[in-house]
Amino acid sequence: MNWGFLQGILSGVNKYSTALGRIWLSVVFIFRVLVYVVAAEEVWDDDQKDFICNTKQPGCPNVCYDEFFPVSHVRLWALQLILVTCPSLLVVMHVAYREERERKHRLKHGPNAPALYSNLSKKRGGLWWTYLLSLIFKAAVDSGFLYIFHCIYKDYDMPRVVACSVTPCPHTVDCYIARPTEKKVFTYFMVVTAAICILLNLSEVVYLVGKRCMEVFRPRRRKASRRHQLPDTCPPYVISKGGHPQDESVILTKAGMATVDAGVYP
């Protein structure tokens, strides 16, 4: 399988990612894609041919293999890696849409017209939601595939010998799996790396939401605090009634200073 196209997509989205997003890309490239291409495919190569049962009944090894391996590990992993990296393409497409919209705006209103976006790749507005939803989708895909693996292969185990009694086997036969320990190690490795990617995605979701909440509520708190603070140019005054009974003038007395006649206000 050619993974060059997938590598180009992930490399393009790397410049729009946060620090946690770049760590996720490194984990996907080094610990998942490379391990899959270099080692995992070789371990499961001709797996059905090496699945041997102690019977000469025609068709029995084939149905037993299908019973215990309904879907190959490597094919499930390939589908998982493709689906988990596709949301990154949405981010690249959204940025490309912004660039095209900005270009048309410049052509229509001239090169000196104010820009539609202060920073095309900055995660604001729709791009922020696209990036956030891509993280949630990637975490959901990895979680779903881990659940599928757990349902198909109990506890992600790889036994050395399995007992099969499926028709057309004449009786319960023992079937032997090729390189079970090596396959178990790779299975656990892929499960652990998928769990790490889920944790990184959820951490990035928390980071983005928390950062956005701070940007929204911090200016409001500053405005509220400024409203409750009295400026230094307006010191406190003591308000008292004047002594003239006809005009009821008001006397403003500042602490430590002479009284000021404020007059009568309608």
Swiss-Prot record:
PANTHER family cross-referenced by the UniProt entry: CONNEXIN (PTHR11984), GAP JUNCTION BETA-4 PROTEIN (PTHR11984:SF30)
SS bonds (residue pairs): C53-C175, C60-C169, C64-C164
Organism: Mus musculus (Mouse)
Annotated gene: Gjb4
GO cellular component entries: connexin complex; nucleolus; nucleoplasm; plasma membrane
Record's keyword annotation contains Glycosyltransferase: no
GO biological process, one term: cell-cell signaling
Stored SMART domains: CNX, Connexin_CCC
Membrane topology field: Multi-pass membrane protein
Protein's name according to its UniProt entry: Gap junction beta-4 protein
One GO molecular-function entry: gap junction channel activity
Keyword Disulfide bond: yes
Segments on the Extracellular face: 41-73, 152-184
Tissues with expression: Detected in cochlea (at protein level). Detected in cochlea. Expressed in skin.
Complexes and interactors: A hemichannel or connexon is composed of a hexamer of connexins. A functional gap junction is formed by the apposition of two hemichannels. Forms heteromeric channels with GJB2.
InterPro entries registered for this protein in UniProt: Connexin (IPR000500), Connexin-30.3 (IPR002270), Connexin_CCC (IPR019570), Connexin_CS (IPR017990), Connexin_N (IPR013092), Connexin_N_sf (IPR038359)
Gene3D superfamilies found in the cross-reference section: Gap junction channel protein cysteine-rich domain (1.20.1440.80)
Described purpose of this protein according to its UniProt entry: Structural component of gap junctions. Gap junctions are dodecameric channels that connect the cytoplasm of adjoining cells. They are formed by the docking of two hexameric hemichannels, one from each cell membrane. Small molecules and ions diffuse from one cell to a neighboring cell via the central pore.
Family from the record: Belongs to the connexin family. Beta-type (group I) subfamily.
Membrane-spanning parts: 21-40, 74-94, 131-151, 185-205
Subcellular location(s) of the protein: Cell membrane; Cell junction, Gap junction
